[in-house]
Regions:
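Cell-envelope/extracellular polymer assembly enzymes that use nucleotide-activated donors
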Residues: 2-5, 35, 187
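Short, acidic, metal-binding catalytic loop of nucleotide-sugar glycosyltransferases
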Residues: 23-33
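Conserved donor NDP-sugar-binding/catalytic core segment of glycosyltransferases
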Residues: 99-131, 210
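Short, flexible, basic/aromatic active-site loop/helix in glycosyltransferases
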Residues: 119-125, 134-156, 160-162, 171, ...
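Catalytic donor/gating beta->alpha subdomain of glycosyltransferases that bind UDP-sugars
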Residues: 171, 177-240
Length: 336
């Protein structure tokens, strides 16, 4: 495995794209064996100009225009532009460590039939809200068993962030589903595993990620995750992961419990007991992340945003895709 391609989808990332590209330039891997494809979705800020300036100085950095302005189309645009042995998916908000590529190559030797490897994300907080969100997303209570955020050991997993893929994976199972606004990476990894490949988490594969500091954007993001997960399930006629069901059940409990509580005092009592238990467990989980009571309470609030938004999106997705049998369309309200 010698040649490597890095694909970066982006749009309006003038604040971050330079840092991302600098981290790649500072990598110790032989640049003669590396190509970087930044797939820009017609940015309206200075992102394109920044990418062009880098590409003029470094022959291995290339700008591609993502005409459809969708993430999966951008990914496929970059992946199909290159025939390298290994292809890495990277985010514009990310920076990789100097030995990132070497450790990806090394990790492929740990198990037979590995199709993808990845590592641990280290959060970089730009403000207090970003730090709260980052803490919540580093908790198993917040995001389930997303090992690239919470994992403490190397081993097989069902998904990773900023994964490196063998070329043969794309040759066998195809590319990212361009119908999906969200969850295209989860859907792709599901197909990868279904076709006999494995995904490996190696903690020495390290990257930094600049966490967005907005509760409203977090809500929208996780609503979309839940909504589009239903479409993925319908398409493959299976529930791709068990952990996705829990926020959905939580939202059903909230709505159902409120209605039943209006009909019976016993149901109201039961509803309040279980609801109180949720907050107790949430606070205990938050207490492991910070000694500050104020920060703990904000993390608990973030837990609720994560669970409620994902669960509500999942519920609406079931209604749209299974009950109303809606077909896919590019809804602007659900795009990034």
């Amino acid at each position: 495995m010698n040649t490597v391609a890095i694909v970066i989808p982006c749009r309006n990332e003038e604040k971050y794209i330079g840092k991302c590209l600098d981290s790649i330039i500072n990598c110790t891997y032989d640049k003669n064996k590396l190509n970087v494809y930044v797939c820009d979705g017609k940015s309206t800020d200075g992102t394109i100009q920044i990418i062009e300036s880098y590409s003029q100085k470094h022959a291995f950095i290339h700008l591609l225009i993502n005409e459809r302005q969708s993430t999966p189309f951008a990914l496929n645009l970059g992946l199909k532009a290159d025939n390298s042995d290994m292809k890495i998916i990277l985010g514009a908000h990310a920076e990789i460590y100097p030995d990132y590529i070497e450790n990806c190559i090394k990790a492929f030797e740990f198990e037979d039939n590995l199709g993808c490897v990845g590592g641990i994300i280290e959060n970089v907080y730009e403000n207090d809200v970003a730090e709260i969100i980052g803490k919540a997303m580093s908790s198993g209570f917040g995001v389930g068993n997303a090992h690239f955020r919470t994992g403490k050991t190397d081993g097989l997993v069902d998904t990773v962030a900023f994964g490196a893929y063998k070329k043969e994976v794309f040759d066998k199972i195809g590319y990212f589903d361009e119908e999906l606004i969200r969850n295209q990476d989860d859907e792709f990894n599901f197909r990868l595993i279904k076709n006999g490949f494995k995904i490996y988490l190696y903690r020495d594969i390290r990257s930094k990620y600049y966490v967005r500091g907005s509760f409203s954007k977090l809500y929208k993001q996780y609503y979309q995750y839940g909504y589009w997960k239903v479409y993925v399930n319908k398409k493959h006629q299976t529930v791709t992961t068990i952990r996705q069901i829990i926020p959905f059940l939580f939202v059903c409990y909230l709505f159902g419990g409120i209605v039943l509580s209006l009909l019976s005092k016993k149901m109201l009592f039961l509803f309040m007991i279980v609801f109180l238990l949720y907050w107790v467990v949430a606070y205990i989980s938050a207490s492991k992340l910070s000694p500050s009571i104020n920060i703990r309470l904000k993390v608990v609030k973030t837990f609720f945003i994560l669970h409620y938004s994902y669960g509500l999106g999942y519920l609406i997705g079931i209604w749209d895709f299974f009950v109303l049998r809606k077909s896919i369309k590019k809804e602007e309200s659900l795009s990034r």
